[in-house]
Amino acid sequence: MRCVPVFIILLLLIPSAPSADAQPKTKDDVPLASYHDNAERTLQRLWNQRHCCPIDLPCCPPG
């Protein structure tokens, strides 16, 4: 009889486990890593532009 509660808990956990097919991907889905990379790249570009020295223009990135 000790196994019954454990068995019931396991049965309850199985349907709630994440599955690879839980949300089918569409062509518009973009991985979060790509958003993170884009945000990081944008912040780096803004940082470089803000710290650009006006006297020595070659230190400024183009754009």
Curated annotation (Swiss-Prot):
Pfam families: Chi-conotoxin. InterPro entries: T-conotoxin. Keywords: Amidation, Disulfide bond, Secreted, Signal, Toxin. The keyword Secreted applies. It is found in: Secreted. It comes from Conus virgo. Residues 23-50 form a propeptide. Belongs to the conotoxin T superfamily. The modification Proline amide is found at residue 62. One of its GO terms (cellular component) is extracellular region. The keyword Signal applies. GO terms for molecular function: toxin activity. Expressed by the venom duct. Residues 1-22 form the signal peptide. Transmembrane segments: none annotated. This is Conotoxin Vi5.1a. Contains 2 disulfide bonds that can be either 'C1-C3, C2-C4' or 'C1-C4, C2-C3', since these disulfide connectivities have been observed for conotoxins with cysteine framework V (for examples, see AC P0DQQ7 and AC P81755). Coiled coil: none annotated.
